[in-house]
Amino acid sequence: GKAAWEESSSELVSDDKDFVWSSASASGKAPAQVKYAVIKSAGDLAAKRVRPTAVSVQILFPESSDEQELKNIMRILTEICEETGLAITCVQAESAEYVLQTVIHITAVGVKENSKQQMKKWVSGTEIILCGYTGLEGTLRLVEEAEADLRTRFTPSFIEKTKRCKESLILPKQILKLPEEAKS
C-alpha cells in the first residue's frame, strides 16, 4: 500500500517478495529531463533497498513538437537505462494542444524481499546509505557531533567542504520567505 507521504508503492507478490514501484515526473524544454526523472524514480526505490529493474515511460508533448525531440529523449533515456542496468518496458508518447511544455513521467519497478524476511538478514555493522535531503542533514549532524573524531580520519579540506554543504539546506529564513513570495 501507499501512504500519502511516500514516494513509492508496493504489492505483495508472494510470502517473501514485494513488487515495488516508484514514479517521478519532469517537465521542461531540455530532453535531459528524462535522465533526472529516471534517477529520481530509481533512486526512490534504491533508498528503500529495492534494486530497480525496469522503467515505463509516458511522454506528453506540445503539438508544436517534432520527431527529433522524441529521438533526443529516447537517446538519453537509453543511455541512462544502460548505465543503470534498467530495462525499458514501455514508452508511450503523444501530443496534445493543451500541453505547453514536454512532460515526462517515469515509473521504475523492482522486487524486494518481504520486510519480515529482509529484517532477518540485517546484522550489526550493516551500512546505511542516506540519500537526498535526509542524507545531507545526516552528514551535517555527524560532522557537528563527531568532528574531532572525523578529523583523525579525513583531511581538513574534506571536513570544511562538508561543513559548507550546510548552504544547501533550506534554512528558516527561506521558509519564512515562502508565504511572502507566494503572495506576489
Where do the protein language model's features map onto the residues?
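Helix-biased detector of long, well-ordered alpha-helical tracts
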Residues: 1-184
